[in-house]
Amino acid sequence: MHKGNHHNSLTNKAKTLFLFLPFAVSATQSQATLSDSTYVHQIEQVVVTGSNQATSRNLLPYTVSVVNARQLETTGKTQLLSALSGVVPSMFVSQRNILGFGVSNGGSGGIKIRGVGGSPTNGILMMVDGQPQFAGLFSHPIADYYTTEYVDHVEILRGPGSVLYGSNAMGGVINVISKNAQHDGIHTTLKSQYGSNNTWQTALSNMVRKGRFSSLVTMGYDRTDGIVEIFDFKQINLYAKIGYELSRYFRLSADYSLVNIKGNDPIYAQLRNASYIIHQNITRGETSLAFSNKYQNTDGALRFYYSYGNHYIDDPKHFHSLDDRFGIIAYQNVNVWQHATGTIGFDFNTYRGKIPMSGGSTSGAGTLEHKSITEYSPYLTLQQSLFNDILILNGGLRMANSDKFGTHWLPQVGFSFHPTEHWCLKASMAKGYRNPSFRELYLYPPHNPGLDPESIMNYEVTINHRFSRYLNTDITGYFAQGRNIIQTQNGKNNNTGSFRNKGLELSVTSQPIDKLWLRASYSYMHSSLKELTAAPKNQYLIGANWQPLPRFNIDVELKGVGGLYIANEVARQNYALLNLGFTYNVTSYIDLFAHLDNLTDADYMINNGYKMPGITCMGGFKLKL
C-alpha cells in the first residue's frame, strides 16, 4: 500500500512540476534588498552567541555560524529547522514529511551537532533572543514551534555552550535572533505559497517603528495532506514583540509566541503491523519581559520568561501532559580594565510537569504526579586582548546548581590569534552538560530517579583565511568525549554510556564576479557509537546565488549525505538533493517565487520507515506594503 501511494505521489508531483514551470520566473525576496555582503562571508560578522554581547565572530575562540534571513528564505522552507538542516557543517535535523516534524512515537525534528544531541533532542539548546526554549517535561524543544517569518538571522554555536547557557547546551546552541525595525515607518508583508501534496503556507507580518517604540507581529498558517494518505499536518502560529527605549541607556521589551499543531501519522503503526492512526494536538506558548541597559563601558540585561505546553496524543490510547517553566536571566558585561571585557551572570529556572493520563488510564505506568526541578547558576567570563588584538584570550566558569543534581563546575578556555589581517587561528576547550529529563527520571519502566547529569569535553582548532572577496575559508577540527551518558541496561536507565566523536569541518565562500555568490561546506564525523541516528558520517553543500538580470534571481544548491545510520535492518543512507529556486521582482511591492526540491528524485529516508518526498514544487507571492 505504501509503495503504491509513493508512485501516485510521484505522478502528482510531476503534474505539479509541469504546472509551475511557467511560473518559475519567480521569487523569494526582492533583489533590491540584496547586497554584496549577502553571501560573501563574513570576516567581520558580529554575533552575540558565545559572549552575551555583540562581538566579531573571529574574535571568539569558539565556532559560530550565522545564517541570515535571505539564506533562510532561499530554501523555500517556513519551518526554521528544515531551512537550517544541512546548511551548517556538522548540523543535521531529522525529517519525515514535506511539512511537519511531529512529536512522540514516529516524530522527527531531532537535532544533532557533531553527533551530539540525544534522542529526543536534549543536548542542543534552542534559544530565541537568548531565551532558552524546551518543553519542561521532556527537556527538548518542539521542532514545529519555530518558523522563519520573524527571524533576522540564526547563530549556531558548534560545540558546548554550557558556561554561558547552562544545561542542554552540551553539544551546541541555536540562537534565533528576531527582526527589529531599523527605521521609522510601518512595514507589512504577506507571503503565500502552494504546491505539492496540497501544501499551503501563508504568513502575515507587520513591523513598526515610531520614535522610541517598535513592534513586530507575525501570524502564520501551514497545512499539507502529506506524502501518503492520512499523513496530514497543520499549524497556526503567532509571534509578537514590542520594545520601548526608556532613555539612551535603558530599553524595555516584551514578547509572546503561541503555536497550535495538529497532525496524523499512519506510518508508525504500519511498521508494527497495526492499523491505528496517531493523532497529535499540541499547544505551546512562551512569553518574556526584558530590561536592558547600555553605557559606554558596560551593558547587560535582566529577563523574566515563562513557557507552557498542553499535549494531547492518541497512539492509539489517550495521552495528556502539561508542563511549564519559569526562569530569570541576568548578566552584565563590563570593561574590566584596558582591552579586557568581563561578564558576570546568573540564571534561575524551575520547570514542572505532570501526566494526568497515559495509555488511556489515569493511573499506572506512564502517568506522573506533579514533579519539579529548580536550577540556579552564577557564571563568569573574561576576554583579554593583547598586542593590539593580535592575540585574544578567553575563559569562563559556571557553577551549575540544582535541587536535584547538586553542584557541577563547568570551565571553558580558548584563544584567537591574528598574525595578519587575513589569517586567524582559534582554539578552545569547553565542558558541556545536560541534566536528566523527567522522562528518564520518573517515566516508564526504565526510569531511574538516581541519575546524574551527562557531560562532554570538547577540543577544537579553527583556521580562517580570507584571500579577498574571491575566497574565504574556514577549517575546523574537533574531538569530543562524552561521559555519564544515560543508556538503558537490564531494563533500567543508568549513567554507563560514553562516546568519542571527532571530525573535520570546511566552509568556503566566494564572489568570483559581480552578481554571483558561491558557497560550499563539508563535514566529516567519526563516532565510537555505531548506532547513532541523525548523524551522517559525511555531509556537504554546494550552493550558488546568481542575479543574471536586475529583477531576476536564481538560487541552486546540492546537498549530499553519506553514511547516515537509520536502523540495524536498514542500509546506511547515501543521497544527493538538487534544489532550485527562482525569484522575480515584479515591482517594489510584489515578488513571485518558486522552489523545486529534490530534482534528483532521490529515494531516501531519515526516520526508519518514513520515506522522504521525491520531486516537490512550491510557488507563490510576497506582497510588501
Predicted regions and their residues:
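Short acidic/polar hinge/loop motifs at secondary-structure boundaries
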Residues: 131-158
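Extracytoplasmic beta-strand/coil segments of soluble accessory domains associated
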Residues: 82-131
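Surface-exposed extracellular loop regions of Gram-negative outer-membrane beta-barrel proteins
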Residues: 269-270, 359, 403-409, 415-417, ...
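Conserved C-terminal beta-signal and adjacent last beta-strands/turns
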Residues: 19, 230, 243-246, 427, ...
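Membrane-embedded beta-barrel scaffold of Gram-negative outer-membrane proteins
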Residues: 213, 299-313, 350-353, 418, ...
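Flexible loop and strand-edge segments within Gram-negative outer membrane beta-barrel domains
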Residues: 224-231, 235, 245, 249-325, ...
